[in-house]
Amino acid sequence: MNGEGVSQCAVERPAATRRQFLKTVAAGLGASAVLGRPVSAVLAAPQQASPARLPTALVGGRICKSHAAVNRLECPERYDAVLAALRESSYFSALKHFRPRPASDDEIRLCHRDTYLATIRRDIESGAPKLTSGDTFICRNSLLAALFASGAACVAVDAVLSGQAKNAFCLTRPPGHHATAERGMGFCIFNNVAIAARYAQQKHQVGKVLIVDWDVHHGNGTQEIFYEDGSIFYFSAHQAPWYPGTGSKEETGRGKGLGTTLNCPVARGAGREEVFAAFQHQLAPAVDRFKPELVFVSAGFDSRHGDPLGRLELTDRDYFDLTGLVLEMADQYADGRVVSVLEGGYDLTGLGSAAAAHCDRLQQG
């Protein structure tokens, strides 16, 4: 990927229209409601004219491969696998490419403490093989890659909120949703989605933000950072019991954030039925109450069947349809504005095909 912009004209939408898509999803669920409303009501609603189509932004670059710590799973080849799958897709030329930039220290401080940033720099300068604050492996270029990963998410926010793109996918690493305010863990250094959410609020005056996390692992860092914040709603559908051991149904927020954390743990072996039920019956009504102005996806593809770090059974088609459900929610309340950021996914072939299915649905809008 060379970072050059491509044509801003999206490819023609396939025959599977929004209306057909809703019917397909509803049939697959065996349910009579989508997003908390009867399908008949959704389909009977007047169809408004769509604005001029905008492209999906693809934000990322080879700089993220410079984080090449001794880790055979969260490896630079993850970037290559996703990029190769996207390049082989029929829609790659319709994506608009944006160059990432490093996040500033002030942007990192939106979610992380100065002491943690100092710890990272000290650990890297000392040549330590992993962060002393957790189990994340590092190398001499890890800080640079992590700064670009967080900065890429901010670039995506700018692209979507300025009207340069309808939505965005950040092809970056290391992932971020396990990183807390003062600790890196679970392959994560900085919490990319959390930083971008705060950035959207501070720079673009966005009010309410929804974060949808479908990684097989619970995003303990994201939950912790926003646990007492009523302006950011965190939803996670994840395997339990599983690493990192957080994310029970009883964890719903605290203080002003009470009711803005929603965890839907599913058992080992769960697949489409269980995960889609969580989206339809738990998330959709919550979104109707919360009414977000911007939506983020912590897009972890280790919930795909066959992933070495997960035991769920989602398929590429499931990610395509889950993306459609998120887009429908964003259409209702956030003018369709969605920023997706890569999290986990460690079977290279499966990661590539799942991410490509996700981006396919994003670019269809």
What are the roles of these predicted feature ranges?
Residues 2, 8-365:
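HDAC/HDAC-like amidohydrolase catalytic core signature
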